[in-house]
């Protein structure tokens, strides 16, 4: 019995020593090279590489790895790695040269990660490579020049990185390359000619200059995007002549000049494909090209000949002066007095018609727009005593402050299209009533209205006239550098929020411009967007009318929350918002912003005092499109975003055009503030908020220490949902715009989180 047990133990030990080396040897060269890549990864938050280790018999079962039977049966090289696909796995690290030493690697997809550094020179050494997708990372530096080895390459995606230098000419000479995307980098220099096999070629949003190459692309090209570069000069007539007629070509926002060639593929484009080129002309643009004059003197005409005689046709019949009667031709002519009378009558008739048309136009214009009217519409005098020194032509009326405005943070309820500074009129400044310099009164005591002043509604639903609005009770809600906001309560109890815009703050010089912008904003309708109802136009001031939202703004809530946390008692905030209510606010904000971005719009100035709360605590986004109604100079100093605002992304100071990822960043800051009652700062709080531990227990403990004490008990019951929200906020405030999710993705994630609560 003992002998049998000894033999069994020996067999087990022998098996261990024999089996383990054999197993290690079974990991072929491809697996070793992949492990070298794994060890270059600094962070793997989703643990996607957890099953990559030496103990496996083959790398073919590893996450993201695909193998194909290419070698001899029953040998370590029977299955070879042909594909490595790990997109959007939040991997941080560098791309090692050994990765491209895998001899049969055909597909490499590491897009939408956090890889940095430069591409190794060996990137194009894998002769079997057919697809390289490294887009949406943080790779930088120049591209390797030697690309002759990858003759089988069909797809190259390096978009949304930080590559510099020139695009190697060898890339454009690859015969099998059909899809190329190098957009959103900082490539410079000339656009290389070639890309004959390309079907999709996207070089947009770079710094490419020089002229358009004549032999770019070929008969297979279906999509060409060279927009947002610095390409200059005229478009060659030979450019795009090989393109199919249904190809999409985008040359917008360059420095192109001259006429657009008449090739069919260019004529079939929309005008937007050529916009942003100030000196470009011809179809499909509506800008006509100037034609140089080629007129010259008619032949055989003497310089002394009268022009009238010069163009008179010569008679071919001979004239006999003896048989011609002197007055024969004179009888067929009109008398000079008759000609003069006809001419005068024509001039008088045309003048009368012109005056009639002008009169009708002016009458219609006055009926539609109160251009010449000057009305003093709720000119607020916020000074307590100085307001009583008004002119005799006006009557002072005192109105009580809106009860809803008596909040901890003062008059911070805000209106659509309105930006309110955090320094709005406070309760101590108001003393329960505010002096309003009302309309000029008539002898009968009624409010005086100019006959030419009209109110224009833009939503197609509201029935409101200026008489009714003039009789409304007015409550001051707040003041900004561009005007005053008040709550107007009609006789039937309906309330509107009205913003008064001073003429010097208004960007529109004419009523039609103002109406066009207001109607464009009013067309955006969503449950989480405030509704614009109408406007008034006057020489001295303009009014913007919208729905009144009764529950204040997030600014009021945050201010009250911070006051409560700094106080020893909880009296400052008797009914704090629960975690479920805050999650509801975040979801509503995401829905509204996603709708805005889907309509190709950007809010660009999301912050707590632009998020209103209705009676059900649903968020209502305001301030959309106000930048189009305000002058840039005033807007940038009063209501626009400032470089010191924590709700603006880091790239705000260097970007000229708002981007949807601005809204994502602002949303992330507010989401973190909803969870922690602290304002995230990319300069000071990045370590505190985003440097999470590898240990799940330590990570959860760190999060619970950051959470707002008012909802800590709620979070304990919904810890997974709260942690998911916290991680989502961290992703939104990434310093790299391409790393932030889209608003549509945020809505999808928040909808799933809400199911857990």
From Swiss-Prot:
Heme in keyword set: no
Span of the signal peptide: 1-26
Domain Protein kinase: 471-753
Modified-residue entries (Phosphoserine), positions: 473, 553
Sites bearing Phosphothreonine, chain numbering: 494, 638-639
Keywords from the UniProt entry: Leucine-rich repeat, Membrane, Phosphoprotein, Repeat, Signal, Transmembrane, Transmembrane helix
Residue ranges, compositional bias (Polar residues): 638-654
Name of the protein in its database record: Receptor protein kinase-like protein At4g34220
Organism: Arabidopsis thaliana (Mouse-ear cress)
